[in-house]
Amino acid sequence: MPKKNPASTAIDSKLLKALCEIQAPSGHEITMKNFLLKYIAKEKKNWKHRPQLIVGDLLQNCILLKFGKPRTAIFAHMDTVGFTVRYSNQLVAIGSPDAETGTTLIGKDSLGEIECTLEYDHEHHAFYKFGRGLDRGTPLTYQVNFRETPTFIESPYLDNRLGVYNALKVAETLKDGVIAFSCWEEHGGGSVGYLAEYMFKKWQVRQALISDITWVTDGVEHGKGVVISLRDRNLPRREFVEKIISIATKRKIEHQLEVEGLGSSDGGELQRSHLPFDWCFVGAPEANAHTPHEKVHKADIISMTLLYEVLMKEL
């Protein structure tokens, strides 16, 4: 018998911690891809419906899971922010990391494991401090310190390992839909266009939910429910967003409405594509975005997964 999906009532902290600990910044998603493929191979026997797994050179490091007769896709990006080793002891950003001097960075090059310290000069250029020089191009990420209380989870890379976690939890009971694990979101995107074209041509899918993490702000609070974004730098089609709000309200799922002028997501790539996709960002809010101290309320994680389960049935 398939196991009952626990996502609506509990947090699988072990899985979320494992996801956060995987070093896979933008451009280096292969480690996350390999983890997900092993996880899917092991767990799919417990899912209510078996998906078709689609991977290969034409999708680069992305993964598609197709369930039944899909109408809606979930996009969850696998990558994180980080740094790339430049020359001497210089670092250049991957995406927009926001870490203080003294932050521990980890990685691996041809000489072995790395655990170095982040430093900045007076012009805020980033450098590493280590006992030897590092290979050019080596990716470095925050050392993960996963902290959990009865109310909160705090860790580097909840953006977007929590979005990936959410997609995996929805997969446990999903009957009809597509889950797309995408690449490069933190560094400008680049994979969503061909993923969207594939599912549009293959299955006529043209609705998308963006399983990602947004910000706690003056209008979005911890513990008040999953965020439905009315807009960020991009503007989704209002009719589609209102349909999502209506479903959340009818089902009495706690939610918040977000209005921002900055920030973007995989939804921005969908909006700029030539395909007639409707999309909406639906995700839990976090404090301390892109720092080693990202913090999310557990109730918001639960409401996020609960809303996704309902939306994938009713959209």
Where are these regions (language model features)?
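N-terminal hydrophobic/helix-forming segments and targeting peptides
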Residues: 1-315
